[in-house]
């Protein structure tokens, strides 16, 4: 835009008065929000219209709305005006159908020219077809107006110029220049200098920064605040009347203090120019940024200190608990301290364990047709599983200690032994109820307790499980049926008694090495033992780790397990029910068919008149 735009008024019509423009400028300077939101210069419009009457009407409407208008009767004249005075044109309003050069050609020419392509072009026509509008928009038009044009449409044309300049970044520079001009005029009228406003803003900002500094207990910005206060004192010295410190120079502008320009006004005060204002703005912005950074740094330091204190407290608690556990045989840590210490120590390990538990939940690899075998599983157990197993053993010790006051002497003997581990595995028992639910199709999961000092169950060097499984199979092949039925009855009676008195829900199975033929499950506090039906079904499934639920694959066995007869029995029952249903359906359909045929014959015998049934005379029927 031109250089003379800075000195124009806010609302400058071609036929307006200067006094009205000055009043509007004073009002605009009073409100900072209006100066930012409303346009600061009159929009100059180039109108290209072939019809004379339409051109005069649109020009009058545009001038009434506050625009400066340059009119052209054809496209060639409009292009000549735009080429010569492209810097004085803000908007082009052209008709699609023009003499000598059409509106489409004028639009394409403007879009191809480097100096004019940033000027928004608005097309107008009485033909409102979609194809024409689409064609204009593709060529680069900013908007399309349909004739007859309304006054409010012309009043809103400045928004296109506003958007274009806002996107190109020219508007910010023009706004700052115009705001400076308006504030200078307002200062000349009111006598309030710009240095006073700047000084008040700097003092206010410094007070805010000092308050934030005292709150954050930081001294990182004191030197900067002292420097700002010195500069503020210098400005206050500049504000004093000129007669006190130095004589009035002959020229208006004098350079002092490193190139800072000082303007002498009529009232005897010194006004620093834009360079000093820009430096003051930069200083205030830097002070604000430094204060914000200082407060953020202090908050971060407090958070880190609190975390370190918490970590040290938790480490001390864990070390104290470890030393206490080494002195005593029973290792005990409060549950909440154990949980917090584990979370504080290593987050990634716990997250991986939780993910593994979620993945392996309800996904068992055990099979009811496989036997227990003793393939070594040391390769499958990693360090994380061992740690989780020790954690579960700690929880079991806590549970045993809490229940010592209520349990008989048998449980008290167990707590004096080395720490125990739990290996839950399924035990198939026909007709055995567990937690009030019968296990007819599946196997109840029992927990095997063994001391930690003893060798692990799944070790390949010991043949405890191999002896147990082989003797259980031989018992199955050679045992009589009478003992089987008696054992089943004993199981049902004693499990009913144990469920009345039991509070814990673990099945403790003790398999001695001397007599591995009988497996005795006992509830946690009842103390009663029963003999499982090992002759009917063999041990099946796979040994699973108690902490991470990782299933260990069973080894291959040379013994072939027969198929389940219960499945065949269920299959035969289903086939019988299906055959019964088919027979019933066949009989029902046959009855319906017979009924339909009989009614059809009766209907054919009845007399009809024009397709309708009529009553039959009894005399005719008797004859």
UniProtKB/Swiss-Prot annotation:
Coiled coil: none annotated. Residues 13-23 have a biased composition (Acidic residues). It comes from Oryza sativa subsp. japonica (Rice). It holds the Pfam family Response_reg. Residues 1-23, 208-269, 395-422, 492-565 are annotated as: Disordered. Controls photoperiodic flowering response. Seems to be one of the component of the circadian clock. Expression of several members of the ARR-like family is controlled by circadian rhythm. The particular coordinated sequential expression of PRR73, PRR37, PRR95, PRR59 and PPR1 result to circadian waves that may be at the basis of the endogenous circadian clock. Belongs to the ARR-like family. Residues 44-162 form the Response regulatory domain. Residues 574-616 form the CCT domain. Keywords: Biological rhythms, Nucleus, Transcription, Transcription regulation, Two-component regulatory system. Residues 1-12, 396-415, 508-518 have a biased composition (Basic and acidic residues). InterPro entries: ARR-like (IPR045279), CCT_domain (IPR010402), CheY-like_superfamily (IPR011006), Sig_transdc_resp-reg_receiver (IPR001789). This is Two-component response regulator-like PRR95. One of its GO terms (biological process) is cytokinin-activated signaling pathway. The gene is PRR95. It comes from the Eukaryota. It is found in: Nucleus. Residues 520-561 have a biased composition (Polar residues). One of its GO terms (cellular component) is nucleus. SUPFAM superfamilies: CheY-like (SSF52172). Induction: Expressed with a circadian rhythm showing a broad peak in the late day.
């Amino acid at each position: 835009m031109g250089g003379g735009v800075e000195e124009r008024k806010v609302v400058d019509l071609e036929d307006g008065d200067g006094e009205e423009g000055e009043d509007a400028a004073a009002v605009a300077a009073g409100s900072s929000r209006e100066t930012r939101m409303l346009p600061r210069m009159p929009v100059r419009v180039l109108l290209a219209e072939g019809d004379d009457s339409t051109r005069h009407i649109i020009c009058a409407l545009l001038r009434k709305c506050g625009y400066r208008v340059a009119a052209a009767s054809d496209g060639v004249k409009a292009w000549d005006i735009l080429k010569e005075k492209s810097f004085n044109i803000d908007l082009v309003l052209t008709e699609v159908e023009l003499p000598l050069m059409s509106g489409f050609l004028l639009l394409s020419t403007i879009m191809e020219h480097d100096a004019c392509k940033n000027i928004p072009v608005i097309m107008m026509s009485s033909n409102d077809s979609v194809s024409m509008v689409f064609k204009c928009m593709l060529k680069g038009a900013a908007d399309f107006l349909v004739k007859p044009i309304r006054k409010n449409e012309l009043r809103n044309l400045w928004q296109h110029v506003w958007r274009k300049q806002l996107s190109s970044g020219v508007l910010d520079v023009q706004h700052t220049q115009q705001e400076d001009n308006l504030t200078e005029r307002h200062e000349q009228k009111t006598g309030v200098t710009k240095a006073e406003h700047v000084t008040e803003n700097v003092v206010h900002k410094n007070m805010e920064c000092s308050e934030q500094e005292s709150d954050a207990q930081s001294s990182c910005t004191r030197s900067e605040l002292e420097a700002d206060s010195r500069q503020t004192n210098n400005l206050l010295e500049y504000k004093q009347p000129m007669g006190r410190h130095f004589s009035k120079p002959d020229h208006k502008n004098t350079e002092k203090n490193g190139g800072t320009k000082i303007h002498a006004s009529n009232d005897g005060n010194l006004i620093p120019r834009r360079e000093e204002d820009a430096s003051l703005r930069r200083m205030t912005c830097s002070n604000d940024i430094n204060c914000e950074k200082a407060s953020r740094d202090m908050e971060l330091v407090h958070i880190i200190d609190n975390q370190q204190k918490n970590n040290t407290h938790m480490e001390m608690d864990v070390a104290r608990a470890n030393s206490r556990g080494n002195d005593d045989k029973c290792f005990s840590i409060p549950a909440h301290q154990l949980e917090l210490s584990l979370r504080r120590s290593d987050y990634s390990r716990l997250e991986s364990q939780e993910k593994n538990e979620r993945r392996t939940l309800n996904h068992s690899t055990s099979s009811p047709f496989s036997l227990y075998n003793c393939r070594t599983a040391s390769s499958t157990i990693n360090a994380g599983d061992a740690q989780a197993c020790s954690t579960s053993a700690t929880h079991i010790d806590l549970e045993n200690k809490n229940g010592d006051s209520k349990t008989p002497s048998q449980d008290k003997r167990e707590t004096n032994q080395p720490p125990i581990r739990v290996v839950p595995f399924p035990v198939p028992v026909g007709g055995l109820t567990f937690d009030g639910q019968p296990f007819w199709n599946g196997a109840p999961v029992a927990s095997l307790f063994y001391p930690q000092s003893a060798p692990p169950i799944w070790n390949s060097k010991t043949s405890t499980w191999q002896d147990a499984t082989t003797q259980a199979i031989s018992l199955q092949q050679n045992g009589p049926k009478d003992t089987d039925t008696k054992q089943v009855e004993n199981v049902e009676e004693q499990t009913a008694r144990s469920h009345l008195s039991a509070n814990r829900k673990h099945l403790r199975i003790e398999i001695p090495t001397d007599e591995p033929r009988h497996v005795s499950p006992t509830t946690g506090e009842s103390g009663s033992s029963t003999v499982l039906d090992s002759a009917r079904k063999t041990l099946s499934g796979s040994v699973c780790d108690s902490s991470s639920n990782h299933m260990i694959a069973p080894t291959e066995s040379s013994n072939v397990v027969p198929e389940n007869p219960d499945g065949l029995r269920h299959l035969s029952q289903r086939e019988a029910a299906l055959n019964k249903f088919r027979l019933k359906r066949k009989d029902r359909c046959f009855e319906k068919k017979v009924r339909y045929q009989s009614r059809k014959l009766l209907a054919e015998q009845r007399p009809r008149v024009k397709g309708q049934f009529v009553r039959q005379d009894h005399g005719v029927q008797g004859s």
